[in-house]
Amino acid sequence: VETYSIDSGPIMPKFPIPEDFGTEESYHAKFTEQDLFDEFTRDEHGNVVLSQEQAEKKIKTLGGYDRLYRIKLEADYLRHLTYIGAHQRYGETLTEEQEERINFELHIMKTMGFPGYFLIVMDFIRAAREELGVSVGPGRGSAAGSVVAYCLRITDLDPLEYDLLFERFLNPDRISLPDIDTDFEDCGRQKVLDWVSRKYGETHVAHIVTYGKM
């Protein structure tokens, strides 16, 4: 048993992005640090919303420019998969509301450094359904408010239909890290844990517990 400070940066393995989509090396050649600075410190419309000091602090908090190249690659691939899923969920032509919501969510996920997390969750939920034959719940908790999660089939509830708020799940002012509550059938839970351990390595998989005290 090890203790872990919630103030520490998240420890996550890398989701395997196909090389023909892009690599960290190709992104280093394609994008400058100024490109990344502008992309990660502005809003989804490209407007400046942070002071220079706040922007520099944000870059540092995300892990510096080397880390930003990885986050951008993951964010671009997440966008690619999300729009594929959006057309499967909503049809060939998306409404303005659907596109605006998707772009807003993707921008928040990117600028908070979480695209890789969503890719990994998508991966093991897909494996549970398609490879392991494990029943997966439709989604619950605040993650059910994410249209991106719906498009990736992490959840099966359309937040737009039920007026669910994404900000309850993830927003820049939220202190705690996001988590996606996922229900697996009892007899399949260990199958999913074993699959994740094999693919991402046992050192990247752990059971966690939180104790409350008065």
Question: Could you describe each region identified by the protein language model?
Answer:
Residues 1-214:
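Phosphodiester-processing cores and adjacent nucleic acid-binding clamps
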